[in-house]
């Protein structure tokens, strides 16, 4: 068994490789686009309406692969912050004890903990994100469908965390959701209210504290998913935005339900 330090080092090195891979692909796509314009070549083929990119554009107005903020030095910094920093700090690991981090119940406005939403013998499926994160908002319809399909056998929780693309720090061009960084908890609750009005879902809803305890415990920035069963982490999803995969989440939930 690896000790905690070894696990964090391995995770850090894996995330560095992933970060460089993403950065290389982003730079390559940008160079290809510039080359096509320079050569006067035809633009790319029409976008498939069912594709992830098309869903994000339709839901939020943002084209991540063409957004200047994603290709800027600030973009590199924030990607490194979420991929390298937040994920290395997380204590939630598959097979380990689920961190019982602090939250505030959106409906009651009372302090609570994440495991308060867990019931014995039933998986708790957690979805972390914020309004300003395009993949999170664009995919929420899929998450709602998963809730509808499995709510009789599992419980679901959405946790609102810090803004992934706040308007004052790392704004995305044409983003439908222009929300500044949360300075006070009231700011975060107001952002959560915007989210609640923007999407339709039937599950528990909680808001992270201003200490970002849940965000840090689960490496949730910019968005992430997790499945908890009887206090153990059964699944921890990939780092958003590129590895935020609700299809994978559903497959993992089916596997947990078969246990």
Curated annotation (Swiss-Prot):
InterPro entries in alphabetical order: Iodothyronine_deiodinase (IPR000643), Iodothyronine_deiodinase_AS (IPR008261), Thioredoxin-like_sf (IPR036249)
GO terms under cellular component: membrane; nucleus
Keyword Ribosomal protein: no
Inhibition and activation profile: Inhibited by gold thioglucose (GTG) and iodoacetate (IAc).
Pfam families in alphabetical order: T4_deiodinase
EC number from the UniProt entry: 1.21.99.4
Protein name listed in UniProt: Thyroxine 5'-deiodinase
Bilayer disposition of the protein: Peripheral membrane protein
Entry's Gene Ontology molecular function annotations: thyroxine 5'-deiodinase activity
Outcome following mutation: residue 133 to C/A: Abolishes catalytic activity
Record field: catalytic activity: 3,3',5-triiodo-L-thyronine + iodide + A + H(+) = L-thyroxine + AH2
Biological role stated in the UniProt entry: Responsible for the deiodination of T4 (3,5,3',5'-tetraiodothyronine) into T3 (3,5,3'-triiodothyronine). Can also produce 3,3'-diiodothyronine from reverse T3 (rT3, 3,3',5'-triiodothyronine). Does not have significant inner-ring deiodination activity for T4, T3 or rT3.
Temperature dependence: Optimum temperature is 20-30 degrees Celsius.
Protein family: Belongs to the iodothyronine deiodinase family.
pH-activity dependence text: Optimum pH is 7.
GO biological process per UniProt: hormone biosynthetic process; thyroid hormone metabolic process
Alphabetized UniProt keyword annotations: Membrane, Nucleus, Oxidoreductase, Selenocysteine, Thyroid hormones biosynthesis
């Amino acid at each position: 068994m690896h000790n905690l330090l070894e696990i964090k080092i391995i995770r850090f090195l894996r995330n560095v490789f992933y970060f460089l891979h993403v950065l290389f692909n982003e730079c390559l796509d940008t160079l290809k686009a510039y080359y096509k314009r320079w050569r006067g070549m035809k633009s790319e083929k029409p976008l498939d309406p069912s594709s992830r990119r098309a869903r994000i554009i339709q839901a939020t107005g943002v084209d991540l692969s063409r957004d200047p903020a994603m290709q800027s030095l600030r973009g590199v910094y924030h990607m490194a912050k979420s991929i390298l920093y937040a994920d290395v700090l997380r204590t939630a690991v598959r097979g380990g004890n689920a961190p019982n981090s602090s939250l505030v119940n959106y409906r009651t406005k009372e302090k609570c903990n994440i495991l308060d939403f867990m019931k014995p013998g039933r998986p708790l499926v957690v979805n972390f994100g914020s309004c300003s994160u395009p993949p999170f908002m664009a995919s929420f319809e899929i998450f709602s469908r998963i809730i509808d399909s499995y709510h009789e056998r599992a419980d679901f929780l959405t946790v609102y965390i810090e803004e992934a693309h706040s308007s004052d720090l790392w704004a995305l061009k044409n983003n439908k959701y222009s929300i500044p960084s949360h300075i006070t908890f009231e700011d975060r609750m107001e952002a959560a209210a915007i989210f609640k009005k923007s999407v339709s879902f039937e599950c528990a809803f909680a808001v992270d504290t201003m200490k970002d305890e849940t965000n840090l415990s689960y490496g949730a920035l910019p968005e992430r998913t997790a499945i908890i069963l009887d206090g153990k982490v059964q699944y921890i999803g990939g780092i958003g935005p590129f590895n935020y995969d609700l299809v994978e989440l559903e497959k993992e939930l089916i596997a947990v339900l078969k246990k």
